[in-house]
Amino acid sequence: MKIAACDFDGTLFRDGAVSGADLEAIAVWRRSGNAFGIVTGRGRNTLLRDVERFNIPYDFLICNNGAMICDEQAQDVYCAVLPEAVRAGIMDHPGMRASSQCAFFAGTSIFTHAGKTDYWIVKDHILPRLSPAEALHLPGLHQISLAYAEPGESAAWSEAFTEGCGESAGVHFSNICIDITAPDVSKAAGMEHLLHLRRWGEAEDVLVIGDDMNDLPMIRHFNGYAVANAAPDVRAASSAVFPSVGQMLRERG
């Protein structure tokens, strides 16, 4: 059996859609006895919204940059909680004040910062709100996500958070967003946890593919791939570049 995992936004989900060719390739891959899943910075519920819309079949979901793992029924089987001391530092950081949006992911729930927008990225999905004090003690909080006006701003704040948090947290940068998790959380670590949980350590091959900076750890760890529209650093780190997820599955199946 082979295992394939792809990033979602910019990799499988491009230009607001998932292509029919990619969906067919995923179906053929799974009919051949292989496993397929998604590894994303999104939370479970925001991911499922589009997974269900496009009827994407899957055997696992790795969400929030590896902080949460879900099975084939979208039930969570692993979660790395963000320590309260780290949360406090993030709440007081200038990068928090500079962000235009903020979301708190806890278990399978998502909340927004009471002092910012009442949505996360998608304006027509209104979410419940929390004050920073409530988020500080929220059970199961495993990711704080911040959004900025443009990628250059988020890149600069990502460096500031990385310097400020040191080894106490994981800082993941992708486009206009920064996601902050417990230390040692990454898409690579999430994949390793998955392989252990599902007892897939003897899999014939593990294929991963992505497009942005938060995909680099898993691409480097698994000698993985990039899609053609990936960031230059991601393409440079990959062992091959494919035009789509489906093409990777067809060629490596």
Across the structure, where does each feature detected by a protein language model lie?
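Hydrophobic/aromatic beta-strand patches that form the interior of the parallel beta-sheet core
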Residues: G37, I62, L207-I209, Y225, ...
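Phosphate- and divalent-cation-binding pockets in alpha/beta enzyme and binding domains
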Residues: T46-R49, A156, G190, P217-M218, ...
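Residue-level signal for inorganic ion chemistry
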Residues: W29, N65, I144, I219, ...
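Asp-based, Mg2+/Mn2+-dependent phosphohydrolase catalytic module
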Residues: R220, G224-G253
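Conserved acidic, metal-coordinating active-site core of Asp-based
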Residues: A98-Q101, F105-I209, M213-M218, N229
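Asp-based phosphoryl-transfer active-site loop
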Residues: K2-G16, I219
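Active-site phosphate-binding/coordination module
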Residues: G20-D118
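The start of beta-strands in P-loop NTPase/AAA+ ATPase cores
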Residues: K2-A4, D59, V206
